[in-house]
Structure formats: C-alpha cells, structure tokens
Amino acid sequence: MIAAKNAGYEGIGLRAETYVDALNEGLFDKDILAILDKHGMKVTEVEYIVQWAEEHRSYEQKYKEQICFHMCELFDVKQINCGLMENYSVEYTAQKLRELCQRAGKYIIGVEPMPYSGIPDMKKGWAVVKAADCENAKLIMDTWHWVRANQPVDLSVIEDIPADKIVSIQINDVWERPYATTILRDESMHDRLAPGTGIGCTAAFVKMVKEKGIKPNAIGVEVISDAILAKGLEYAANHTYENTKKVLEEAWPEVLQ
C-alpha cells in the first residue's frame, strides 16, 4: 500500500482474504483504518464473491459474503466485485444474482464478465443483469477480459446497456497473442501488462467508456503480472501508475483533475 501511495495511487481494492489475513495477524478494524488514514489511502473496491449461483452454497462462501458486506460498511465502499466460474443458463443465473442483490441490500453487486468463466462476455453479462432486474446489479468492464473475449473495442458491444449499469472499470493491457484457451486463466492471473504497454488497446477502451457516458465508481488498475512484480513492489507501483497516467492523459484527462 505504501508503494502504491508513493507512486501516486489514491486507493486500493481489497480482497476478503487479505482482510481476514490482517485480522489473523492480530490487527483490529480500528488498526486497519488507522493505517489507511496514516498513509492517506482509501479502499475503493471490495472483492471477490464467487460461487453465488450454487444451489447449496457452502458456509465458507456464506461467511465470505458477510465479510464483504462488513468490509463495505467499514471502509465506506459502495460496491462488491463478483465473478462466476460456473456456467448456468441466463434465467437461473439471473435468479441467483437477484438473491445475492437482495442479501447485499444497499451495496452494488458488480458482475465481472471473464472469457474463461460462466459469464464470458458483456452479452451474457448484460442478459443476466437485465433479467435479474435489481437496481444494485451492475457490470464491471475490464480491458484484459474484454479483449480476450474477442470483443471489439467499439461502442456497439454495449449499445444496449445503460451507462449507469456499468459500475466501474479496470484497465490494463494484453499481449498480441493470447495463451491457449485451456490455460487462458493462467494468463489472466500471471501475465497481464500495464496500460498502454501491450497491443495498445487501453486508450481506445477508456475513450469508449468516456463516450458512452459511463461514470465509474472506481477506475482500477488491475495488472496481475509475475514478471512485473518480480522487479519489486516499488517498481510495480511506479510502472503501472506512470503508464496508466499516460493513457488517461490521452483518453480521459478530466478524470485526473
């Protein structure tokens, strides 16, 4: 977090597992809040609820869900990011999303389409969110997932989706050649690129978001990369921040003000 702050970042996304690890190390909520305050940082996103469409959810998943709700209350975060690896029909998935949204109450459930998941693209993502018909059911747009789902960076992909149904965006970049389909998730979890340093899709992606009139709760930089991280936290934070800033200065300078 200190490296992120020093690089220029204003906030962080926090996973439920990371929060629980902090508690397990002996920290209390007040301690975590004090650390954030000391470094002038805030939590802007909470994640990651999965397996929410299971007919019989495990207690682990139920507990994790409640932890996410608590984290939103603690850190004053409006949204929880969610994914779904299992593949079900639109109708069934929408029903389970509706139930999750009801449990979430005032918090927004941000559904993230991922090409190797049960919600692989924006088309199915919107079909599910639309059918769920909940005010707090929305979508997340991620550059890497977008490109690897073979979606053109074009407004036509989201022409039927209201701008206010996109809750946040996550930006990064991709290699020209994807991993094989069977191991595509490995690329997602280990080999992403900083914005503007791959095939160069990030600026166009951000411009598309701007032109659509989307007002994201958060613009996250999600660069999961073993190679970048191997160079150290300070390098990773500076490298991703500097390249993100370049992209935003080109595509959407207003958000930097």
Protein language model regions, located:
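Residues that cap or flank secondary-structure elements
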Residues: 23-24, 60, 92, 117, ...
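Short, conserved active-site loops that position catalytic residues or coordinate cofactors/metal ions
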Residues: 7-17, 45-50
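Conserved beta-strand positions in the central sheet of alpha/beta enzyme cores
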Residues: 13, 45-47, 81, 110, ...
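Active-site-proximal loop/turn and secondary-structure-junction residues that shape catalytic pockets
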Residues: 16-18, 49-52, 79, 84-88, ...
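Short catalytic/ligand-binding loop motif for oxyanion handling, primarily in non-cytosolic enzymes
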Residues: 22, 89, 118, 178, ...
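Active-site acidic/histidine proton-transfer and metal-coordination neighborhood
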Residues: 35-42, 52-139, 203, 232-235, ...
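Histidine-acidic metal/acid-base catalytic patches
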Residues: 1-8, 73-76, 105, 122-141, ...
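Glycine-rich, proline-tolerant flexible connector loops at the mouths of alpha/beta enzymes
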Residues: 13-37, 87
